[in-house]
Amino acid sequence: MSWWWAGAIGAAKKKIDEDEAPRNYESVALIVGVTGIVGNSLAEILPLSDTPGGPWKVYGVARRPRPSWNEDHPITYISCDVLDSVDVEAKLSPLTDVTHIFYATWTKRSTEKENCEANGKMLKNVLNAMIPNCPNLKHICLQTGRKHYLGAFEDLKSKCHDPPLTEDLPRLDSQNYYYTQEDILFEEVQKKEGLTWSVHRPGTIFGFSPYSMMNLVGTLCVYAAICKHEGAVLRFPGCKGAWDGYSDCSDADLIAEHQIWAAVDPYAKNEAFNVSNGDVFKWKHFWKVLAEQFGVECGEYEEGQQVKLQDLMKDKGPVWDKIVRENGLSTTKLEDVGNWWFSDIVLGNECWLDTMNKSKEHGFLGFRNSKNSFISWIDKVKAFKIVP
């Protein structure tokens, strides 16, 4: 069994030095959201010599200029605002050799109604530019998430399904931009005969991207670095259910492998799949791991006084600037690398677990050891000098 299905942490990194160019490309990928937490993993894994469906030529799309931490990936980087239909048409419609689309981006608005409008428009812009112009387009992967079962952030879990969460559960009776995206996908693929799709629903993602709006590991690293700098205890900013209860997560590399599997395996076509690591953990154990990684005193759950990172970190911008200067870190602003709102949601609620049975029944046997995953992504945040 190759590393591809073995769930090996860091296997992709070990392969990079072995690959040789040039190659004749079998498949051509378009990653939309290439600087995001999963897009970055796709950009690392797709070009490898033994990636199924390959050799792959890869285009990567993101709104901002290419960051230094993404530059080593052997892809063609395209700066494009997918919310702007004119920009999309000009920059993406010429990519007529694309065979597979990996859509892994989103934008955050103040209400779910606005989320539906903006995120629906983004996906539709991309598909309108690609489907009519790519004669060999075979498959579209759409990444959504577990809020499919739990509801939008503004009414999270108010009317959610009882876990374990399975792919055949009906949609909730509420607005959800994931539903909007799915409906657009289902409608657009009908316009090209033989074009297939897959939907991927991860839980909380462990991965690396300083540009991600939902980067839990990076955010916790920044919090721990500030505690280290100030000699403070690493207080747990969450609820008892998160501290004592079972949680799970989705490794970004695993999600990338899951999407590539669905893109090339006939048995995975036209299906929606959960994607998580396949094990469970408790935050009270991972909190000790985080404290050890940064050499800080580990706090405990504080009965009756749940703290929030948004409150603890609201005045820490100057502190972070000092940490960056003193340690020669990559230049970042606290508001960019600290997704406090998202961390407060994850740690402020008990975890609603899913099941990977459907993926396994369809042939995907990938998994991750979540503790090893957590540590490996912490190491990557340090390696790219985001934290000391």
Curated annotation (Swiss-Prot):
MF terms (GO), sorted A to Z: oxidoreductase activity, acting on the CH-CH group of donors
Pfam family, one: PRISE
Catalytic activity: (S)-8-oxocitronellyl enol + NADP(+) = (6E)-8-oxogeranial + NADPH + H(+); (S)-8-oxocitronellyl enol + NAD(+) = (6E)-8-oxogeranial + NADH + H(+)
NAD listed as a keyword: yes
UniProt-listed Enzyme Commission number(s): 1.3.1.122
Signal peptide positions (record): none
Binding locations of NADP(+): 35-37, 63-64, 81-82, 105-106, 143, 178, 205, 212-214
Active-site residues, as the UniProt record annotates them: 147, 178
Biological role: Iridoid synthase that catalyzes the first step in generation of the iridoid ring scaffold using the linear monoterpene (6E)-8-oxogeranial as substrate. Iridoids comprise a large family of distinctive bicyclic monoterpenes that possess a wide range of pharmacological activities, including anticancer, anti-inflammatory, antifungal and antibacterial activities. Catalyzes the conversion of the linear monoterpene (6E)-8-oxogeranial to (S)-8-oxocitronellyl enol, a precursor of nepetalactones, which are metabolites that are both insect-repellent and have euphoric effect in cats.
Similarity field: Belongs to the short-chain dehydrogenases/reductases (SDR) family.
Protein name, UniProt field: (S)-8-oxocitronellyl enol synthase ISY1
Naturally occurring in which organism (per UniProt): Nepeta cataria (Catnip)
